[in-house]
Every structure is written in structure tokens, then in C-alpha cells.
A protein has these predicted regions:
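C-terminal regulatory/interaction module of P-loop NTP-utilizing enzymes
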Residues: 1-238
Length: 238
């Protein structure tokens, strides 16, 4: 998605995605109800979920805060053993287990309900989510990386979905969801030199360690960013 500046081709799509009553206008498409119209309108479908791959090298462009605000950034890194096992000459049969009937319909129904604001997460559990992100907000705000309504709304939706999809919902699952959202929604926007983000990364790491290993994914990523900062005096999420 970032072989070109994303804003040049994706900004209109993001706007339509957030305003369902503002349909796409398609040039050259005739509306069947009015053959005189040269421009048709297409509403954003509720069952459309966008997943894009990102290339990270010197030939690509990083995403802007506008895009990052509306996305969950999921970083995939291959396991060392999986990489080196490619040298093996033995071929392995690939087995794909099909999803059970009704999974896609259930997922769509869950997405619609969560988008409408429904949540079965207990108040005390959501209060714990708020406490952790309040501490994170206080740290990021001092450095100009505070998050706003959209980010909070999407984090809450993620927590609600995690609750429904989890086989059990204890402290470990709550902090796992918090950890994933800190990693996917907050950290990707952080970048800068040692003076700009050095202290902030230290304070965010302290928040992760306050919860033991429950925010382990974010703690490891922060350590990686601090390593870059020490080596080249600049760090970013990727």
C-alpha cells in the first residue's frame, strides 16, 4: 500500500468508510433509477474489511498519522527456525482446515453490533483499560503524541471484540488486548530523535513493566526502538 503516498489514492476511501451516508461517486457509472445521471453512487458495504500489506525499505513511503489513526498496524516477523528450515530439501504437505459454516456471518454480525456501540465487557474491566491508557495518554501528551476520540473508540471496539472472541476473559486476556492495542494503535505513530522521544520511551516502558509481563509485546517493541535510538540517535516503530 505504500509504494506511493497513501493519501494520494486512499484518503477519499477513508472518508467514505467513516461516513456511511456519504456514498462513493463513480464516474461513468449510470444509476439504473436515473439513466440521465453520468455519475453513480455506491454506499460503503458493511461487510467490507480492508487489509493491506506494507513494504518497508528505502523505496517506500511511511503512513501519515491520518492513516495510522484509522488502522491497526500488525507487524509480522518470521521465526528464525522457520526461515532456516527453508534450506531443508524435504517437502511438507500443506494442510488447510476450512472454517466452519456460519463463521463469516457471525463475524459480520459481531462487527455490526460492536460498531453500534454494544459491549459486554464488565465496567470494572473497562475501567482497568481506561486506567492503563490514561497513564499512556499522560506520557504521550507531554510529547505531542496524544491520541484522540477516534483512537479511543477503536480501542474500545477492539477490546469488546476480544472479549467476544476469547474463550475465557480473565486478567491475562484483558492485558493481552491492552498490550495489542498499545502496540498496534499508539506506538506506530512515535518517531524522532533521542531528545524528542527518549524520555517518553523510558516512561512507556515503565508502564509496561508495572504490569509485569502482561504488556510484554509492547515492552519488547519499545526496547527495540530504544536500541535504534542508542545506535543511530533516531527511532521509529518500523
Amino acid at each position: 500500500m505504500n509504494l506511493s503516498h497513501v493519501e494520494r489514492y486512499f484518503s477519499d476511501f477513508l472518508s467514505h468508510m467513516e461516513t456511511p451516508d456519504n456514498p462513493f461517486e463513480i464516474d461513468g457509472y449510470r444509476n439504473k433509477d436515473n439513466e440521465d445521471e453520468s455519475t453513480g453512487k455506491l454506499p460503503y458495504p458493511e461487510n467490507l474489511f480492508v487489509i493491506g500489506t506494507v513494504n518497508i525499505d528505502e523505496t517506500t513511503y511511511m503512513f501519515s498519522p491520518k492513516v495510522l489513526d484509522r488502522a491497526n498496524v500488525v507487524e509480522f516477523k518470521p521465526d528464525k527456525d522457520d526461515v532456516l528450515n527453508m534450506f531443508s530439501s524435504a517437502s511438507q504437505e500443506i494442510k488447510i482446515t476450512p472454517a466452519k459454516s456460519g463463521v463469516s456471518e457471525a463475524f459480520l454480525r459481531l462487527a455490526k453490533e460492536i460498531r453500534s456501540g454494544k459491549s459486554r465487557v464488565d465496567e470494572w474491566q473497562m475501567a482497568e483499560v481506561r486506567n492503563v491508557f490514561t497513564a499512556i495518554y499522560d506520557i504521550t501528551e507531554k510529547n505531542g503524541y496524544e491520541f484522540a476520540y477516534r483512537t479511543v473508540r477503536e480501542i474500545k471496539q477492539y477490546i469488546s471484540a476480544a472479549y467476544e472472541l476469547s474463550g475465557q476473559w480473565a486478567d491475562a486476556e484483558i492485558y493481552r488486548a491492552i498490550d495489542e492495542q498499545l502496540l498496534q494503535k499508539v506506538l506506530p505513530k512515535i518517531h524522532g530523535n533521542r531528545k524528542e522521544i527518549g524520555t517518553m520511551l523510558d516512561e512507556l516502558e515503565a508502564v509496561c513493566k508495572q504490569n509485569g509481563k502482561e504488556l510484554e509485546l509492547s515492552r519488547r517493541k519499545i526496547e527495540q526502538m530504544k536500541g535504534k535510538l542508542a545506535a543511530v540517535q533516531y527511532a521509529s516503530f518500523i
